Amino acid sequence: MSESPMPPGTPDVPGLVVGRFDPPHLGHSYLLDAALDRCDRVAVYVNSGPRDAAPGRLRTAWLAELHPGAVVIEIVHDLRTDFDDEALWQRWLDLFRAHWPFEHGPEVVCSSDPYVSELARRLGAEPVVVDAERLTVPISATMIRRHPAAHLDRLAPPVRAWVVANWL
């Protein structure tokens, strides 16, 4: 498994980043920038469901604005996360493949989360872990949802404005 920093992109290496990005923060931007540096093309799947704190379409638009080199796709579903459930894994893989925007791949899956190795293996891709300990950008979306006012400095301007208007 690779660890960031990553070597410069090579032609025709499509990458995948998956997350809720609820809300997107500077740690997510660090991850996406690392994926864009490593891969020729990057698809970003924004998992979206009815219980999310920020609307999925808005999170998708923010990420597309902040990372114009990525193809950002909202994936609306009600799937839970259970890494021991084979049938559920298959549903996740079917969902991801159905939305894949490129002719082949992914060849690389980038994440800061532990599931990256298994997801990459199941997709036949290389797992790339980026700042798993969150030392480079010490923040998580959970921390922001719990105490938004304390972490406004970890949000890009459009996200910060929305959080201030809607959560504070």
Regions found by a protein language model. Name each.
Residues S2-L168:
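Nucleotidyltransferase catalytic core that binds NTPs
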